[in-house]
Amino acid sequence: MTSTANYNNSGKDSYFSEIKKSELGLIKNNLSTAINERNADKIKDILQRIIYYMTIGMDVSVLFPDVIMVASSNDIIIKKLVYLYIVHYSKSNPDLLLLVVNTLRRDCIDRNPIIRGLALRSLCSLDSKNTLEYATIEINRSLTDFSGYVRKTALLGLAKLYHLSKEAFDLDIIIPKIFDMIMDQDPQVIVNAVSTLNEIKPGWSFTFDLVQHLMIKFKEFNEWSQCIILECLSRYTPSSEDESLDILNLLDDRLSHSNSALTLSTIKIFLKYTDEFEEIQEQVYERIKEPLITLMESSESNETSFTILHHIHLLMSRSPRLFNRYYKHFYCKFDDPLYIKTLKVQVLKEIASNQTFIESIDEILQELSEYVYEGDHSLCKQSINAITVIAQKHKNTQEKYPIDESVLEKIFLPYLSVSSNLGGAGDDNISINEGILSFILISLKDFLRVFPKHLKTVLPYINENLIGIGSVSNYTLPPSANESVLWMLGESPNSQVNSPYIIEEFFNEKFDQQPTFVKTQLLTTSLKVFFDRPGEMLPILKRILKKCCSDLSQDPGLHEISLFYSRIILLLDIDKAASIINSSKQTTSINTFLEDEINEYRDKIFDEFNTLSVLFGKHSTKFIKNKKQIENEKLQFLENQKNYLLSITDGNQNNNQNNNQNNNQNNNQNNNQNNQNNNNQNNNSKQLLKEIESSPNNLIDTFILDQQPELSPELFQSLWLSLEDGHKIDIQLDSPIDNSEIESVMSKQGIICLAFGSVDQQTKLYYYARQNLSFDIDFNSEQNQQQPQPIFIIEILIDENTLLMSILFKSPILKTLHNKFIPKFLSILSIPIPKIFN
């Protein structure tokens, strides 16, 4: 681009051409020419070019005085471009900003309502306390403007200014005005008034007249505005059942809306207003289930489907059988992401757990069994767990619906049979099948706890398909799976399985690698088998007890249990000992499940329907921090950083004192020892090093920096804010310098550049370094070597106009900073800047 004409001839694509170094100067000249010629088309093209540069991150703030010259133009497009530029650079040009305020205020009373609204929005977006007074005046005037566009803009500007300075507004005056504007006839003004009131006075209460007005105007709002209104209405409590029904009748058609946010907001109102009317709420549940199913299946976004699915899952905590007839809609699709498949499995589990039709339960169980071979271990585990829970939940109905036998014969036993093919499969198949087998064994234990009568059926399969091809030790099973197999052997010790020899082999090969709970289960199983087969089990039991009692330090808990079992066997007869150990076999009824407690917890977040609480599965107080908590955490973080820095300084000083004391003590104690000469030699060497260090001629050579220091930007910022200025040096440069050359020289010496850039004609560079204490003469003891290394942080500012370089140093150890680091830093800096010491 070499002339002004290029702006006219280049077309729309010219805004995205390659940036040239001389572009800003050319734009400045062309803009001045276009202003003098009063050529609106040229001004538009130039301003569009400037805005493009601004959006890609290029600093065009130098053009601020020239751009504000066209702010008084009557062209709306030019005004939009100018105001966009001014708002973006308002903070970096606070002095020049006052030159635009008069233009903005003049536009706030323009005849054109679009210009009035544009000027008002820009004036409120300056985010400067210098313009706050002027903006407040215009806001108060515009709240009563005859144009709805200006009034709704003024309301949003009011919310912005209130957060900028709460003292600028008298709430006793401004809040009644906002309430009056809620009764406005313009729908957008009403919505903005509600939103502004939410910002200024959260939790404000409705009146009947206000609700009636909102309901009358409700159909005029757009769908997102309706969501805002409904969210506020969820805080309103109708005075009677008739009032509730009137509101719900007006909102009924919103349940079938294609916007999922609007549908969920409407459902929240329906559930809230019928909470005290059980019969009506049952009808509401029936009314909302089909819209939810439709939204879940018709949504093109997986994220939306996931959100709807979570709300369906939450509704099932209130109405467990609500979706019983719709269970096929929750079958996993081949292209569903894992997070949706996992949630669908949970929904299917709850549907089947509360299902009464055996055919439906069988279909769900068969569907879940197919997911076991999906390939993902997480989904496999969820599916097996769901199958187990479904069977357990139907324990009391097994006479009518023998779910336990169906689960055992169609799912668990076939999986155990498949596992016998492990030996002939490839490595990949072995890994997958072993993972499935582990989940099966763990769930099988939970299944048999509820249905112990099936133990005699399961153990032969385990003996044939797992133990019969080698033994449990041939499989790389996790500890929980090993513990499950051992538990099953102990619960049926009189079976035909060779339990003593299985236990012996497991003890010989795997015992030492197992965690405590597996060792404890092995010990308990050994005792139970011993009571039924003492002749075979006695030698093995002696070895196990001896092993468990031998080492107290390794496993004190197991040691105590083994001593307890030993005393039972020695002090009591076999029958009494067996009655004590086998007391857990007494018949107990399992009626309460963890899922029931989870449902109660889910019921507590029902009031936060259509919020993130539903997705997170926790109340908002658990993941949203208030301002006080955030402020306390910030103060605690700064305090921790301060203590850390103080510990570095104090640690080095204490180490030096301790070393001196230790040296004096060693000198006194070693006077009569044979190694006196060696100690004297060490002391002389240390004294010599101290003399070298204290010598000005060796001030730099004995100071070594870490060549690969690490410091995060967050920690750098925290240190910079918490440390006081250590030393500042000003250097007048003769000519501009190459930042990359300085960075290259510094990095070779262990001084690393964290960030650099140019802002407002000022180049900024930030460096950090750490001292390598392994070369320090006081860094001798192992304790000292564990101390953090001293940190040095540097800021270099170069004025691009005057070429004045200002260097600011900070460090928690000022003595080392002044005596060692600064001379070394300046010595390194003299390489790219030779005249630095002149």
UniProtKB/Swiss-Prot annotation:
It is found in: Golgi apparatus, trans-Golgi network membrane. One of its GO terms (cellular component) is Golgi apparatus. Residues 652-683 have a biased composition (Low complexity). The keyword Signal does not apply. It comes from Dictyostelium discoideum (Social amoeba). GO terms for molecular function: clathrin binding. May be part of the adaptor protein complex 4 (AP-4), a heterotetramer composed of two large adaptins (epsilon-type subunitand beta-type subunit), a medium adaptin (mu-type subunit) and a small adaptin (sigma-type). Pfam families: Adaptin_N, B2-adapt-app_C. Residues 674-838 are annotated as: Ear. Residues 582-673 are annotated as: Hinge. It is a peripheral membrane protein. It comes from the Eukaryota. SMART domains: B2-adapt-app_C (SM01020). The gene is ap4b1. This is AP-4 complex subunit beta. Residues 648-683 are annotated as: Disordered.
